[in-house]
Amino acid sequence: MSLPTGEGFGLNDNILETNVINLAVVVGVVVFFVGKNLTSILENRQETILNNLREADQRASEAREKFNKAKEQLELAEQKAKQIRSEGLLKATTEKNNCLTQYEQDLARLDEYKQETLQFYQQKVFSQLYVSLVSKALQKVKQKFDKRLDNQFHITVNNFFIARFTEYNP
């Protein structure tokens, strides 16, 4: 199969050129009319994106501020907790010392009371013993006088010693 000269492949070159021209005109019209709208849409989209970026920056800035405030509040809370802990330890130590002091004072008072009680009972026993010894001594003296002396001498001596013992205060 051979092709005749001058006819080519059988394509109509004229139609191809017309199609290219028509395509160029359509593209030009589309660019002319749609280009403004497309530019407007792109500008609106760009403006929306920029606004979103500004809002995101603003929200990020607010978030940073809130984070910093929260961080400061956390530091203040930690300081307050440390202060409360140290005050609690100080108060516990003070209370412990007060309890120990009170215990020592109570112990000293009990010891003093014990000593006073011992002294009281010692004095009571000495007093009873003294009275018992004096009465026994008087009985022995009376017995000796009753055996050896007459009644008149006995009465004189007894009155003398009774007077002396009644004047004596231990």
From Swiss-Prot:
One of its GO terms (molecular function) is proton-transporting ATP synthase activity, rotational mechanism. The chain crosses the membrane at residues 15-35. It is a single-pass membrane protein. GO terms for cellular component: chloroplast thylakoid membrane; proton-transporting ATP synthase complex. Pfam families: ATP-synt_B. Disulfide bonds: none annotated. It is found in: Plastid, Chloroplast thylakoid membrane. Keywords: ATP synthesis, CF(0), Chloroplast, Hydrogen ion transport, Ion transport, Membrane, Plastid, Thylakoid, Transmembrane, Transmembrane helix, Transport. It comes from the Eukaryota. The keyword Cell membrane does not apply. The keyword Membrane applies. InterPro entries: ATP_synth_b/b'su_bac/chlpt. F-type ATPases have 2 components, F(1) - the catalytic core - and F(0) - the membrane proton channel. F(1) has five subunits: alpha(3), beta(3), gamma(1), delta(1), epsilon(1). F(0) has four main subunits: a(1), b(1), b'(1) and c(10-14). The alpha and beta chains form an alternating ring which encloses part of the gamma chain. F(1) is attached to F(0) by a central stalk formed by the gamma and epsilon chains, while a peripheral stalk is formed by the delta, b and b' chains. F(1)F(0) ATP synthase produces ATP from ADP in the presence of a proton or sodium gradient. F-type ATPases consist of two structural domains, F(1) containing the extramembraneous catalytic core and F(0) containing the membrane proton channel, linked together by a central stalk and a peripheral stalk. During catalysis, ATP synthesis in the catalytic domain of F(1) is coupled via a rotary mechanism of the central stalk subunits to proton translocation. Component of the F(0) channel, it forms part of the peripheral stalk, linking F(1) to F(0). Belongs to the ATPase B chain family. In plastids the F-type ATPase is also known as CF(1)CF(0). This is ATP synthase subunit b, chloroplastic. The gene is atpF.
